[in-house]
């Protein structure tokens, strides 16, 4: 508590500091008695007054005013002891508490602000796994999603995957209201929690590609190590930005922020299980897709220090409202459908991996029937973008897909050209080989018999004609192949004559 003295009347009171029951009280705060309706009304009016001046309002430690926690802290049930020892003598039954505090305070605030200043965005800091409650029940516009930071940091991957699934089954729109972050002024810096290597960037990539609002902490991009509290007026450490860290943000993260329109909505968001070759779900892999404005994206992140590989195919259950808003149906889709790809064996999909800028090709029918196969290193991620479909009219794309066998290339167009030139390359290798050059240019091979020489010349003749045939097929041009072959044979004979003269 702190001592308050009225300098005019001399009246003295001892007032509690704010407290969440987990550590020392907040000595820059005074705790109000929210059991009094006039207090709740006064605070609500103050919020509305602020809303007339600012479009966004953030409520610090908002969860401490939720009914169940306010009761736990300040008016505990008889026999429970309470989290603030001196409040035990102020215990109160549930009935008494509900009579004095009948409606959730934040529900009243949201409703009254909506009526008075409807364009105001209300953002709540709510921990203790109350994020969903603040959005679903209290109607808060945005809520800090501390579960993202804590669970990804601790690699509680199965729990966080289930958290996302639960939201999708209840109401997918809630995902849009989460503020995802990797640190805040009350926590250690992002780099103390996630490092500065692959785990940090994998988590950061998730943060900026999930629906909701990504939030960067002060100094996060620069790699500052000093923890900044809300009370800090200046930095106390002499730190400089980490240039390599900044460059990697510019290369991997910032381009994704320019595509928030692709990631922020939930109507086309789908979440997947990552199925390993032995048929098990790898709970350490976060896999999801989204699409908007004709663009599509697939994101995968392996939040574990181990390699993995597997398939993504069927999405998790997702609530879909019907024409009757009171009813919802649970739906799922396979990845080809989620990306709105043609289910046709004659179509192929080409896409680019943002992490390495390589391009890949997959058959549409295979994507629909089998899903997408992906390999991931420890703490590695893939973000597949720039999807486009092509029709395979003359089997050139099927040949390319078979040739690449899942591998990525810098440019599909160049790889396609290289694939089309494969017959020409193979024919040329049969001509320009080691045996020919040894025969023509190494003196020890001048002792070949006449029959041996004739066989080599005939082989060159045959292979050269095949080579010219392939060139003609590729260019669709006719030429005097017989003349070219005769010219080559003439050159070979000339070379042989020169060799014989040298020998002589």
Regions of interest found by a model, annotated:
Residues 1-259, 265, 341, 361, ...:
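Alpha-amylase-like alpha-glycosidases and glucanotransferases acting on alpha-linked glucans and related
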Residues 251-253, 331-341, 401-434:
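Active-site-adjacent segment of 2-oxoglutarate/Fe(II) JmjC oxygenases
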Residues 277-338, 385:
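Carbohydrate-binding surface patches
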Residues 297, 367-399:
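C-terminal beta-strand-rich structural cap/linker in extracellular carbohydrate-active enzymes
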Residues 160-166, 266-293, 353-369:
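Flexible, glycine/threonine-enriched loop-and-boundary segments that flank and lead into catalytic domains
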Residues 326-368:
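Trp/Gly-enriched beta-strand surface patches
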Residues 387, 412-504:
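Terminal accessory regions of large proteins
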Residues 228, 307-314, 391-394:
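Cytochrome P450 core scaffold surrounding the K-helix E-X-X-R motif
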């Amino acid at each position: 508590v702190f001592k308050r003295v009225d300098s005019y009347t001399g009246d003295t009171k001892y007032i509690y500091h704010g407290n969440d029951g987990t550590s020392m009280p907040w000595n820059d705060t005074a705790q109000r008695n929210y059991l009094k309706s006039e207090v709740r009304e006064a605070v609500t009016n103050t919020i509305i007054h602020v809303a007339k001046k600012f479009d966004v309002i953030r409520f610090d430690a908002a969860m401490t005013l939720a009914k169940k926690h306010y009761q736990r802290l300040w008016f505990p049930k008889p026999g429970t002891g309470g989290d603030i020892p001196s409040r035990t003598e102020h215990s109160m039954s549930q009935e008494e508490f509900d009579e004095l505090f009948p409606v959730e305070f934040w529900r009243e605030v949201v409703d009254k602000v909506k009526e008075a200043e409807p364009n105001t965005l209300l953002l709540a800091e709510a921990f203790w796994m109350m994020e969903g409650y603040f959005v679903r029940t209290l109607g808060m516009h945005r809520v800090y999603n501390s579960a993202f930071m804590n669970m990804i940091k601790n690699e509680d991957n199965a729990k966080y995957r289930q958290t996302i699934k639960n939201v999708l089954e209840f109401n997918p729109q809630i995902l849009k209201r989460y503020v995802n972050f990797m640190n805040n002024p009350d926590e250690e810096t992002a780099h103390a929690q996630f490092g500065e290597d692959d785990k940090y960037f994998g988590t950061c990539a998730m943060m900026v590609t999930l629906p909701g609002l990504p939030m960067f902490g002060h100094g996060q991009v620069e790699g500052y190590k000093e923890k900044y509290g809300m009370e800090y007026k200046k930095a106390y450490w002499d730190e400089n930005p980490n240039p390599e860290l900044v460059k990697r943000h510019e290369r991997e993260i910032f381009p994704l922020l320019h595509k928030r329109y692709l990631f922020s909505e939930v109507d086309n968001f789908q979440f997947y299980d990552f199925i390993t070759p032995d048929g098990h779900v790898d709970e350490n892999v976060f896999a999801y897709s989204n699409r908007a404005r004709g663009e599509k994206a697939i994101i995968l992140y392996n939040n574990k220090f181990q390699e993995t590989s597997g398939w993504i195919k069927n999405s998790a259950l997702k609530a879909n409202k019907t024409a009757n808003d009171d009813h919802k149906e649970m739906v799922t889709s396979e990845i080809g459908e989620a990306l709105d790809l043609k289910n046709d064996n004659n179509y192929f999909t080409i896409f680019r991996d943002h992490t390495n800028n390589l391009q890949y090709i997959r058959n549409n029918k295979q994507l629909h029937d089998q899903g997408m196969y992906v390999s991931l290193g420890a703490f590695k991620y893939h973000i597949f973008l720039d999807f486009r479909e092509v029709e395979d009219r003359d089997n050139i794309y099927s040949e390319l897909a078979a040739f690449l066998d899942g591998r990525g290339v810098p440019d599909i167009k160049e790889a396609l050209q290289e694939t089309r030139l494969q017959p020409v390359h193979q024919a040329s290798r049969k001509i320009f080989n080691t045996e020919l050059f040894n025969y023509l240019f190494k003196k020890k091979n001048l002792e070949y018999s006449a029959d041996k020489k004739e066989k080599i010349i005939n082989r060159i003749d045959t292979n050269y004609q095949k080579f010219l045939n392939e060139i003609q097929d590729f260019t669709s041009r006719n030429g005097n192949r017989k003349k070219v072959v005769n010219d080559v044979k003439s050159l070979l004979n000339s070379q042989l004559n020169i060799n014989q003269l040298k020998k002589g």
